Every structure is written in structure tokens, then in C-alpha cells.
Amino acid sequence: MWNNDVSISKQMRIGVVSYLNSKPLVEGLQSLLPKAILEFDTPSRLSTRMKSGEFDIGLIPSVEFLAWENSTFIGGIAVACYGQVQSVCIHSKKPLNQIRSMALDEGSKTSIALMRVIFEENNWKLDETKSFPMDGNPHDIHSDAVLLIGDRAMADYLPGFPFKMDLGEEWKRLTGLPFVFALWAVRPGLKLSAMEIKAFHEALNLGK
């Protein structure tokens, strides 16, 4: 259930993902919406905080958004890829088809869901998963592989993990389609003006 106690006001609260891949979407947004309050967090925490009523607008994981009722989004803007995404990758000690255990970055449920679809489509078996904290060190992992998102996923290769798969690239290989990781969700009951919507599109243009 949504918490709709937050009233609509000119000082809207905007939840933003604290990764480099979202920077093009927020470049200049504060100057375009000077009364807005921008707060940065991980995708999964933003989703929880927005649903509890902390944000009017949030850059929310697509899997989370699809499960929400009565919510809308700002069209034409997303964290998306058509092929390599670079910031959502599996780093593995073994060839991908030999992985049996994986540590999963706690920062994004969308990336975990995408990983599971990719494994199913490839008929790869995964017996064990565990959560990998945002401040965790990959070198402490005893699993066969680790799914990383955000800035720390962007290393070419991690020492001790000679195999790597970019999930955006693998999704395109399997389906030929782009993939949307996150979008600007708007809480139920909030009606954005044309100028406010335009500000988000202008921010994207500034970030390109």
C-alpha cells in the first residue's frame, strides 16, 4: 500500500540514484527546479523510501515500478541500454555456464531479476544466492560469482574473477531488445505541470 500522506507542494522531493549511469538524467535538474529537494540513494532503497511517501518523484527500478498500482512515470526518459550497459555485470571465477553460487548486489532488484531471466534463457543452473552488501569487498566472496551494479561494476576485470558478463549485452544477444533499468516514477495523486515535465527532459539534454 502507498503512503499518500505527503501533500503536493512546490517544494517537491526527488529521489535520485547515486551512480554515474544516472548522472545524465539529473545534470542541471537542481537549477531547472530550484525549489526541489534532491536526495541520492541506491535504487532499492529509493524504491522503499518512495513507497513510504518520502519522495514525490523517484528514479525507480523498472521491476519495482511494474508492481506498483496507480503510479505514473515521466515518458521518454530512463536508465536504459541497447547492448552493453557496463554498470550491471557478473564477475565470475568460473565460466558463466559453470556458476552454481552467486553473491547479489543488494542495490537493485531489477538487475537481480534480469540475471535470473538470463540464466533461465541460457539453461544455466544457479543453486545458491546470497545478498552482497553495498560496502562489501568482492575479494571476501566465497561464491563462484558476484553480480555488481553501479560504479563498482565498471571495472574491466576484478582480480580473482577472470570471467565477466555485461547483462545489457547478454539481454540484447538473447532478445534483440533494449532494456530499461530505471525510470522517473511519479507518486499517485501528483499532477506535474508541463513546465515541470519539461525540466526533466531539459536535464537529460544537458547531460548528453
Residue spans for each PLM region:
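Pocket-lining segment of extracytoplasmic ligand-binding domains
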Residues: 131-208
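A conserved helix-loop-strand patch within extracytoplasmic ligand-binding domains
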Residues: 77-135, 165-166, 170-172
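Beta->alpha turn/N-cap motifs
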Residues: 19-21, 42-43, 54-66, 77, ...
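A bilobed periplasmic-binding-protein/Venus flytrap-type ligand-binding module shared by bacterial periplasmic
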Residues: 28, 88-96, 101, 179-195
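Short, polar/charged alpha-helical segment
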Residues: 18-41
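Short, well-ordered beta-strand elements
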Residues: 8-18, 36-39, 100-105
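Short helix-initiation/N-cap motifs at beta->coil->alpha
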Residues: 37-48, 124-144
